[in-house]
Amino acid sequence: MSFNHYYQSELTALRQLGRRFAERSPALAPFLGQAGRDPDVERLLEGFAFLTGRLRQKLDDELPELSHSLMHLLWPNYMRPLPAFSILQFDPLKRSGPALQVERDTPVESVPIDDVRCRFRTCYPTEVLPLDLTALTYSVKGDGSLLSLRLEMSCDGHIGELDLSRLRLHLAGERYISQMLYLSLLRNLEGIELIPLDAAGKPLNGANGTPMAFRMPGDRVQPVGFAEEEALIPYPLNTFRGYRYLQEYFAFQDKFLFVDLNGLDLLKSLPEDTLKQMRGLELRFDIRKSGIQRLRPTLDNVKLYCTPIVNLFKHDALPIRLDGKQDEYLLLPAEYDLENCGVFSVEGVTGWKPGGLGYQEYVPFESFEHDPSFDVPQSRPHYSIRQRTSLLHDGLDTYLSFGIRHTEAHETLSIELICTNQNLPRRLKLGDICMACEETPEFLSFRNITPATSSFAPPLSRDFLWKLISNMSLNYLSLANVDALKVILETYDLPRYYDQHAEKVSKRLLGGLKSIKHQHVDRLHRGLPLRGLRTELTIDPEGYIGEGDLFVFASVLNEFFALYASLNSYHELRVKSTQGEVYQWTPRMGLQPLL
């Protein structure tokens, strides 16, 4: 509940209930019921309402000293705001040669908004090639379809110079089409045909005079977005990765609409003379069953050289003078207004002693490195973090407090932060994230092809943290019925706490979950018996945009359940649609598929 509610409640009580009390007991409160317009008296009443409102809020805050400390110790990522996300696309290289590797966490900037540049960083490592996607054709073939992508060199040179082994595709544009393409490429793909092209765009002929073509199996297309190095936001290593998949799905589903086409290194087996003649490539995806025959994908639906980006950047806070006169100190990012810059995490605190006496590193209280009873070499100064819902903007205010210690030296603290621009990126348009930084590779041009999402702070004023704490003891018995699964999924859907449209979409999505069953199964793996668990989930597709929407959601649930498996056991998921479709994934032991 917001502080405004407490303040208005106390002010109303003073002015309305106070008048009624004076009418009933005039001898006890002769002045409480008198109307007055003295501004000094009004100021006193408002100040009193402000103080008592804070007191009531403190009584109702559900022990943040316990829940916040526990979360900072175990899952500090859920105490951090959810920053803005978008998709960035790099333009093809203008020089021939191997791919240019754009590493994860490469910084980029937007054009200025109110003299503030929003700063982002990339989430996926991206290989940028001098290949351009110039044409996409889609044709119906019986019950199936054929998707053809034509790639051509964007500069002088030939395919043999590229050292091509993998190509990443982002399925973009209209959500229904992109999700159906995701389903088609990962579930209904019969095979892939690779056709080398000459400078005129015609198929190259082999030694026998017939056009060359290479056939690849459909399993060469693999999903993207589930690896540790493909996380949208930093997660501690001790947290359960399955919850990250859920949080990322509800916050930015576009993150999962990527696929990798592997096996392109087979081109290296061609004679050198043939490679020098190759100026392009045609990829034909034979889809055995298609649900998008009436909708035609275009070049807007398949993109190359894309990566999700997140609005996170390193920054310093204004220095703090540790004089012992305050219980806690508000962190203020330097050079920014609070509305345009919020604290995501505290990366380091350094205390500088006056008189050139050196410096000392402060450690988080939850690390226990400050306590001699935990076998640390020496006691070190420590700090604690506390977040509160801000009264001035939509984000959180972050405070630091320090242990009781000698403060006569009046240290000056420098604090390293990771920050966000809060909701300022919402004002960016398509193409506005196009400015390079110091660490951005040279000769690359880029732009955002989707609007930036909203930023959401964790709803600390509700029972959100206690729901998270209750999830620490979850197991498969906790997921014995579909209502329990829905509660877990709701917990990690942060946008639903703030956005009414997101809440409606979430209710529609979770309303499609009809039943869940678990069954213990045994199988032989490499000659050894192995115990596992099979989960059968029944979903009504009426609550989804289409079959592709259901499949993307089920794919995320498959990764979630696979990581939920007990030690030395495996998990397999089977999803049944009430309209008859059945999806089954390869049994998994954690991250390892059982083949």
Where in the sequence are the language-model features?
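Aromatic sugar-binding surface patches on proteins
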Residues: F85, A251-G263, S384-L400
